[in-house]
Design a protein with these regions (language model features):
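ALDH superfamily catalytic-core signature
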Residues: 78, 86-178
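Rossmann-like NAD(P) dinucleotide-binding subdomain of oxidoreductase/dehydrogenase enzymes
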Residues: 1-122
Length: 178
């Protein structure tokens, strides 16, 4: 069960090892972003990789309906979900009825720690990248900033200067950073 923000990357990090281990995989992308995973699965099928028909399946549609069906199905031996806490709770509850193993990554946020001896220009670049990459829509976004009081004001100034250099606009436009 794959989220919308990095649908292909997050799907493949679970699909590849499962296929390598000889497992059949049913992938369910977020209903907002199914195309990249569908295109990848089609490319795998057309490339004649030797993967037997039906070993890799992509199911699209309502997350609640399909996720619930997969989590409770007796033929499902394991579930990997990257998503929100409410979805994780629902999948875990349904899967627990059959004792199906579940691996959850539920959208935690990372922290940046900045100490007094830090290079503040480098720290500002890292902070901006960590929180604003992909518009901050990442489970590991550095959305918490813990800064020693001795460098707080200087770091804020450096962050403002750094983010001021970032072109803002439509995501597919040339040179846009945010």
């Amino acid at each position: 069960l794959v989220p919308w923000n990095f649908p292909l990357q997050l799907a493949l990090q679970s699909i590849a090892p499962a296929l390598a281990a000889g497992c059949t995989v049913i992938a369910k992308p977020a209903s907002w972003t199914p195309l990249s995973l569908l295109a990848w699965a089609k490319a795998i099928d057309e490339a004649e990789t030797g993967l037997p028909s039906g070993v890799l399946q992509v199911i699209t549609g309502s997350g609640g309906l399909i996720g619930d069906a997969l989590a409770g199905h007796p033929g499902v031996d394991g579930i990997v979900l990257t998503g929100g806490v409410p979805t994780g709770k629902a999948v875990m509850a349904k899967a627990s009825e059959r004792l199906t193993p579940v691996t959850l990554e539920l959208g935690g946020k990372g922290a940046h720690l900045v100490f007094p001896d830090a290079d503040l220009r480098t720290a500002a670049k890292a902070v901006c990248f960590g929180i604003f990459m992909n518009a901050g829509q990442m489970c590991w976004a550095g959305s918490r900033l813990i800064v020693h009081e001795d460098v707080h004001d200087d770091l804020v100034e450096a962050i403002v200067a750094e983010i001021g250099k970032w072109p803002v606009g439509p995501g597919l436009a040339e040179g846009v950073r945010m």
